[in-house]
A protein has these predicted regions:
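Catalytic active-site module of serine/aspartate enzymes centered on a nucleophile-bearing elbow/loop
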Residues: 344-358
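Accessory cap/linker subdomain of secreted extracellular hydrolases
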Residues: 253-293
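Cap/lid segment of the alpha/beta-hydrolase catalytic domain
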Residues: 151-175
Length: 358
């Protein structure tokens, strides 16, 4: 039970050993969770009775922030432009959805086998599919999967993105959750890609909508990875997490566009949202994870320290499947980016996704 195992471990100084995927043993003492933030532990879940099973929220205490978050910038940035090159390597396609012609770019490594896995990569707000993450194609070359970079629809201010009800998106009728599900089916059928092994990742606005999909359509993708994504308050007013799913989040503690500690008063202008640890805690709870491992990734010279929190032994997402996991990469001092100067982010995403391939 989550309440008896994890909460007790938070109060005790017990430890266990496990593998972190780097060939090392790691200490799984839960007292390290206090390092996540000085205001929120990962298991301090703000009350939402219908969102998670009752046994997953026993004894969890609502957090009370005692300080205002730093005002967020309205600008959204990604990694340097020279790291992005999709146009030269991808094929461009269109499809009809909700009365609109939608664009996407598809990369298939040479010699890709029929029924290969698929990873869909979502750009940030104001971004472009043609400036998608080049490194994911490099990982695809080594591991044999297809990569799709869809293009977001422009909002009334002319900024492309995914509809998560930013103030600038007011009046938009596009349902991007439905579009992304339809896109995955289009790709699977048209290009003979695996319906069982289709994954979703995205950065910033692309990560935001992943939280919404995790609530509305948790079975639509085999696993999901959000980079600098947010769970907005309105999402859990209308929806909740009701089904286990493998989930990963990468987030910098000095991200002043998507604040680690949240923005409950909407000072940043994107809409009110909860702290990142609180958002991830909801997904841990619905997964029913009972084991936790903490490790520091090898630190690159002159770069930020990355700590990986792995939550395991959850409820299987499919009957007879393996227990789910939730991974949180905390980038100490990290900004609003893919954090790929601090770690090999795309390889880490695939390392997580590849565990769930049938």
């Amino acid at each position: 039970m989550l309440s008896s195992t994890i909460i007790a471990a938070l109060l005790a100084i017990g430890s266990a050993l496990g593998s972190n995927g780097y060939g090392n043993t790691i200490d799984s003492r839960f007292d390290k969770l206090s390092d996540l933030t000085d205001k929120y532990t990962l298991y301090q879940v703000i009350s939402q009775p219908d969102a998670v099973p009752a046994e997953a929220t026993d004894n969890l205490v609502p957090s009370q922030p005692d300080a205002e978050p730093v005002e967020a910038s309205l600008s959204s940035s990604e990694s340097p432009a020279q790291e992005y090159s999709v146009k030269e390597r991808c094929e461009r396609y269109t499809m009809k959805n909700q009365g609109l012609e939608r664009e996407y770019n598809l990369y298939r490594p040479e010699g890709l086998k029929a029924g290969a896995p698929l990873v869909i990569v979502l750009h940030g707000y104001g971004g472009s599919a043609l400036k998608g993450k080049k490194a994911m194609m490099d990982v695809a070359d080594k591991n044999g999967f297809a990569v799709c970079y869809p293009q977001g629809i422009k909002d009334p201010k002319g900024k492309p993105g995914w509809n998560v009800r930013y103030p600038s998106q007011e009046g938009m009728k596009t349902d991007d959750v439905k579009f992304l599900i339809a896109l995955s089916k289009e790709l699977q059928k048209r290009f003979d890609l695996s319906p069982k092994n289709t994954f979703l990742t995205g950065m910033s606005n692309g990560g935001d909508i992943i939280y919404l999909i995790a609530m509305r359509a948790p079975k639509a993708f085999k696993a999901m990875a959000s980079i600098a994504g947010l769970q907005f308050n309105w999402m859990e007013t209308e929806y909740s997490y009701k089904h286990p799913l493998p989930f990963m989040e990468v987030h910098g503690t000095q991200d002043h566009t998507s604040e680690w500690l949240g923005d409950p008063e909407n000072k940043g202008g994107w809409g009110a949202y909860i702290p990142v640890p609180a958002a991830v805690s909801r997904i841990i709870a619905v997964n029913g994870c009972t084991e936790e491992y903490v490790t520091e990734l090898p630190r690159r010279e002159g770069r930020n320290q990355v700590t990986l929190y792995q939550f395991k032994a959850g409820r299987p997402a499919v009957k007879g499947g393996r227990p789910t996991e939730v991974w949180l990469y905390k980038v100490e001092g990290g900004d609003h980016s893919w954090s790929d100067k601090d770690m090999d982010t795309c390889s880490e995403i695939w390392r997580f996704f590849s565990q769930w391939i049938d």
